[in-house]
Amino acid sequence: MVNSDYNVLKDWMFGKLNFLLEDLDPNPNYSILKMSLGEPTLKMPDFVRHELSINFNEWGKYPPSAAIPELSNSILKYIERRNPGAEKIININKNIVPVPGTREPLHLVGLLAKNTKVGETSAIVTNPFYHAWRAGSISSGSKIHWLNALPENQYLPNILNIPEKILDTCVIMYICSPSNPHGGIASLNYLKNAILLARKYGFILAIDECYNDIYRLNKPKPVGGLDAALSLGDNLDNLIVFNSLSKRSNASGMRAGFIVGDEKIIDSYKLLVSNGASPVPIPIQKAAASLYDDEEHNTKACIHYDQNFQIVEEYLKPFYEDFKIPDGGFFLWLKVDDDEEAAKILWKKFSLRVMPGRYMAKEVDG
């Protein structure tokens, strides 16, 4: 009665962590500190409260599947600042759609890839992985081909050594920059090569850029899929980019962001939303517009994370010769002898909740 393909979703990182720690008590002398998921604890700007308040009556209206004009314009201006020149290849009515955060669309885009090739199909997924990428791959009806993100490749998957038979059958590929959880940043050439592969072999390239606005301020801003598409020409063919306010604006609970890309993908996604997925309520769209208009709060967040990493480096560098502050994101990916045992010790001794790396990854090639 229930599709057994989804049984694998029971094997997910947060459920595993709960099971690992459920019989262990944290140290009562310390406040519990959750460092096991990407939930910012910084405050949202006060103007968000104002936007939600003055638009209270809009809660009575069904939200459209497309962006309201205020949000479309704010997103386009944000793209002009973030990916200069990319606005020239974007039609705000055809290439952009608001989303309730990116977890849902990362999953649903897999449905759009289903039945786009004949026979057994493949989905290429970065490993370690965010669980929505796996869910989307399953929904595409494909067998997952895991690509390891290793330190020798700046914690990005090596996309140039994918077997031809996998590329021929691929319907969707998920990559992430800055990478989750390592914080590795893809170069422009890397992203261009990914787009060229998608176009040559006819699959959807889904680029998760949810951490794209969290980076070290002494480094250049990360480039993105739109920069790569612009450098290749004047279109967004085969590409879809995911952007969220959860990390950029400390707005995880607001569930707001956008996807931008190939008109055919966006058009199908709008139809999917209209028939059975979640549009973004108008008050949230208006609050999201105000957040995309403002850069100051995001800069403050980057400063905060920079300071945190400097403190961590001071304490951990003596114990880790190869300690490196990640170029992007706000996670710290540390090599330990036994990740599960380390998680239990940190919980029992310091009330610190961390995620064992093995829970975010699949064992591939030993």
Model-derived segments and spans:
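N-terminal small-domain helix-loop-helix segment of the aminotransferase-like
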Residues: 3-101, 291-292
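Conserved C-terminal alpha-helix-loop-beta "cap" of PLP-dependent enzymes
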Residues: 22-26, 331-366
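Conserved core of the PLP fold type I
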Residues: 60-197, 213-214, 218-233
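Conserved core segment of the aminotransferase class I/II
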Residues: 78-79, 229-306, 313-314
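A short helix->loop->beta-strand "cap" motif at the edges of active sites that frequently abuts
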Residues: 121, 200-204, 236-237
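Helix C-cap/helix->beta junction micro-motif
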Residues: 140, 200-201, 319, 350
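Walker B catalytic acidic pair
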Residues: 209
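Conserved glycine-rich beta-strand-loop-beta hairpin in the small C-terminal domain of fold type I
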Residues: 285, 289, 305-313, 322-336
